[in-house]
Amino acid sequence: MRGLILALGFLTRLPLPVLRDFQCAELVRAVVWFPAAGLVVGAAVALAAALGTVLDPWLGALAGVVMWAWITGGLHLDGLADTADALGAAHRDPARFLTVLADPHVGSFGVIVLVLQLAAKLVLLHWLLTLDLPWPALVLIPAWTRWAAAGWTLLLPPLKPGLGERFAWQGNRAGWGAGGLALAAVSAITPIAFVALIPAVLWGVWMWLKLGGQTGDILGAGIEWSESAALLLAGVSLALARGIIAG
């Protein structure tokens, strides 16, 4: 249970018991609980969207996006902004990329990408609400993206010292695999949730080929990218299945 509390405390801003005696190694082992934390995020987003949709789909979409940002504390959005700034200013220089990535200030690239990301989630979530996306799929998409993020830390080397480095060398691969199997079993009730794996794999391949590893900021950016892309793929899949888009 300590692992679940640590995972929720790290990935969400929910009011939880404070574990004052925890060691950093415990947080690393808590990576197996990242999918469970994702389920909590997804459930909160789905609930907010469902309540808002009672009045209007746009209000439901806005409520969902606000909840998404609030419950995660903007953690992954911060990583997305930092990664965008680094990519925009690095000019293919790996050393400069890491230098800009470590800068706590948000630049123009980061601001632009943040606005686009929030707008994309708002529009895509509204589209999915009008398509009657199965609620379990919305719950499962954040779980899959966080499971994927845990996998990136286990499979890719860290680009710099930090928490990402500890995850990489001390992570629990067996627990991560078991978490994936459990998520797959749950996702069988709404297979459209599996679309989240497509952008997650693509982001992992991109990190491997273009960057050669991962950092916490890049992992956060990957979660945001994977969530938005998964919403888009889910919408296209539903529209195709219902004949709204010609196949």
Curated annotation (Swiss-Prot):
Cofactor(s) recorded in Swiss-Prot or TrEMBL: Mg(2+)
Cell compartment(s), UniProt: Cell inner membrane
Entries under InterPro entries matching the protein: CobS
Function: Joins adenosylcobinamide-GDP and alpha-ribazole to generate adenosylcobalamin (Ado-cobalamin). Also synthesizes adenosylcobalamin 5'-phosphate from adenosylcobinamide-GDP and alpha-ribazole 5'-phosphate.
Pathway it works in: Cofactor biosynthesis; adenosylcobalamin biosynthesis; adenosylcobalamin from cob(II)yrinate a,c-diamide: step 7/7
Regions that span the bilayer: 31-51, 57-77, 109-129, 136-156, 189-209, 218-238
EC number: 2.7.8.26
Family indicated by similarity: Belongs to the CobS family.
Any Pfam family the entry gives: CobS
Any one cellular-component term (Gene Ontology): plasma membrane
Membrane topology: Multi-pass membrane protein
GO biological process: cobalamin biosynthetic process
Protein name per the record: Adenosylcobinamide-GDP ribazoletransferase
Catalytically driven reaction(s): alpha-ribazole + adenosylcob(III)inamide-GDP = adenosylcob(III)alamin + GMP + H(+); alpha-ribazole 5'-phosphate + adenosylcob(III)inamide-GDP = adenosylcob(III)alamin 5'-phosphate + GMP + H(+)
Keywords of the record: Cell inner membrane, Cell membrane, Cobalamin biosynthesis, Magnesium, Membrane, Transferase, Transmembrane, Transmembrane helix
